Structures are given as C-alpha cells and as structure tokens.
C-alpha cells in the first residue's frame, strides 16, 4: 500500500514552526537577502517501498513554498541502475539542489566516488553561497587510522584544514551541513574537534557567525546548543530503525515481501522534512512536518536501546532557540 503525494502534502499542512531570533552585524547585513530552502534526511530508497512518492511530495511542497534550493542530507540511495527512477525524481527539481553523503549511500559495495558520480557531485565536502549566506557541506565518512570496525564516521585532517581555511578567508554568516551529528556520541567520532573549529570562527568574527549546524543520520528530531551553536538533527523522511529483535509488519504482507528491510523499522505515515527561512532582518524560522507511526511505535514494541535518546518521534517539531548575533565590542 502506498500513500499518494496528495496525502503526503495534506499532512504537511500540520507543520510546526521554530523561530530563531538573531541580529546580523552591519558589515555583513548589507549583502543578505531572505533565503528559503528545503531539507530532507535519510530517505532510504533501498528500504522504503514508497520512497519515490515521499521525495516527490517534498519537492512539490518546496516548489509551492518557492524555495531557493533543496538539499538532501545523506542516506539517500545506493548508486545503482535500479534507483534511476528515484534519482530522476530528485533531479526533476529545476532550481539549485545540493547533496550530502551518508554512510548508507555506500552500501552494496559502492564507494563514495560511485555515489558522488551518480548524483553529479564533484566533491564530498564543499561550500556554496545562497542569498549572501555561506553553506559548508562536510563529509563525515572519512576513516581514521585507528578506527574500529563498522561504518566510518570521521572528518579527516585534510578536510579540517580546508574547513579552517574556508572560514578564515570568508566573512558571511555560515550554515553547516553534515550527515552525522557533530555532537551526538554516535555521530562524527571527532565531532568535538570539528566543533572547536566552528567555535574558533565565531570567536575570530566577534559574533555568532555560525548560525546552525544541521545533520541527519540518527533518525531523531532534536536540537542541542553547544557553546552558542545550535546543532539540529533533522529526522528521517521515512522511519526509525528498531532492528532485528523488534521486527514486525507495519504494512500489508505483500509490501514486506518485496521490501523485507521495512520489518526492522517503525515507519512514519507521512514524509518528514524541514523548510528553513533566514530573514536578513534577523530571524531564522524552521517549519517542520508532523506525522504518526505506521503500526506500533518503538515504545509500544518495547524498544529499549533508544530509551535514553531524545527525539524518537514521527515529527519534525517546533522549537524555540535564542542566538546571540550582536557583534561584540
């Protein structure tokens, strides 16, 4: 059973809104314009039976909201021919679009280079300007020399040097995008080291230049402020993972027969995404989407591994955040 794009868009009308108050220093404010962009994370085409419809609903909503650009935050799809129709949905967007590399985008034996080539990415980490704001995309999939097994989750020395140089050679307000969180313990394993670079940029600028850092990966709806920088975890578009011990059927049997990985998830009835507006007069707004669980929730399944995690919910919710943007004297 598939929800239609119209069903998904109807659910999006119940979106929450987060308002961030800010004040830009005069030396940068003159070059800023209102910026509107859409952000989705962890669609997981290779798990979800209705990933194409979910992605299409997101893009249709962003078109109606007149977004300047859209971004997907990783764990998008494996770079293989079977996913070409899904890629075509993504590439149907007529404006600017940006990609972040997730760890599961290399499942099936694919490399980062394979994924980048599949989506037309020159590099896994890069920077771009939109309406006077500088976006910095990081690749959290480096592997350091003494890394344990499992998926790599590191920002290497070369990339950190590039980040430092990019921040020191520019003056614009900054938004950071990375798949794995820089503050979650199961995110980037040297997240504190990367955060220190961002904090140093704020100190050098004399104001809260790094407006926010957005990530996906954890399938959580959460926000934590660390040393004046908000770290926003954008929930998965599709589900929360509950694993083998809590596998169950949320959809009709025929759906699970064709898409067996869904049984390890608690799916969201509607696709989740965030719509962000940055107003040069001094306001950052995050609109989200509220949905519901398909079948039992993780709590109803007795899922214990996530009992201490914040943000296990089928929503991208409203939040109130205060940013100190005034230039220090």
Which role fits each region the language model picked out?
Residues 140, 177-182, 217-218, 289-291:
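Short, well-ordered beta-to-alpha junction loops that form the rim of enzyme active sites
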Residues 167-185:
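Short acidic, glycine-rich surface-loop motifs adjacent to enzyme active sites
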Residues 257-329:
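A short C-terminal boundary segment appended to hydrolase-like catalytic domains
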């Amino acid at each position: 059973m598939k929800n239609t794009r119209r069903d998904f868009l109807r659910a999006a009308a119940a979106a929450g809104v987060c308002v961030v108050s800010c004040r830009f220093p005069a030396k940068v404010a003159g070059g800023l314009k209102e910026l509107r962009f859409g952000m989705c994370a962890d669609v997981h085409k290779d798990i979800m039976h209705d990933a194409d419809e979910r992605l299409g609903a997101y893009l249709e909503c962003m078109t109606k909201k007149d977004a300047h650009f859209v971004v997907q935050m990783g764990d998008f799809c494996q770079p293989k021919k079977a996913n070409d129709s899904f890629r075509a949905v993504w590439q149907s967007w007529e404006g600017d679009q940006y990609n972040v590399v997730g760890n599961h985008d290399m499942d099936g034996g694919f490399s980062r280079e394979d994924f980048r080539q599949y989506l037309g990415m020159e590099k896994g980490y890069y920077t771009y300007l939109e309406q006077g704001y500088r976006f910095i995309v990081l690749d959290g999939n480096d592997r350091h020399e003494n890394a344990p097994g499992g998926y790599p989750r590191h920002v290497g020395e070369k990339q950190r040097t590039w980040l430092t140089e990019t921040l020191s050679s520019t003056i614009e307000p900054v938004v950071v995008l990375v798949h794995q969180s820089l503050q979650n313990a199961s995110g980037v394993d040297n997240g504190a080291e990367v955060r220190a670079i961002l904090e140093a940029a704020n100190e050098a600028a004399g104001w809260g230049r790094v407006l926010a850092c957005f990530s996906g990966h954890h399938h959580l709806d959460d926000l934590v402020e660390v040393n004046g920088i908000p770290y926003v975890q954008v929930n998965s578009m599709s589900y929360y993972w509950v694993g083998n011990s809590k596998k169950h059927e949320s959809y009709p049997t025929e759906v699970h027969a064709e898409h067996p990985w869904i049984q390890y998830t608690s799916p969201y009835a509607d696709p989740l995404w965030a719509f962000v507006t940055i107003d040069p007069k001094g306001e950052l707004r995050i609109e989200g989407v509220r949905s519901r669980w398909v079948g039992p929730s993780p709590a109803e399944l007795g899922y214990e591994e996530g009992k201490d995690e914040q943000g296990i919910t089928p929503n991208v919710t409203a939040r109130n955040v205060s940013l100190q943007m005034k230039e220090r004297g």
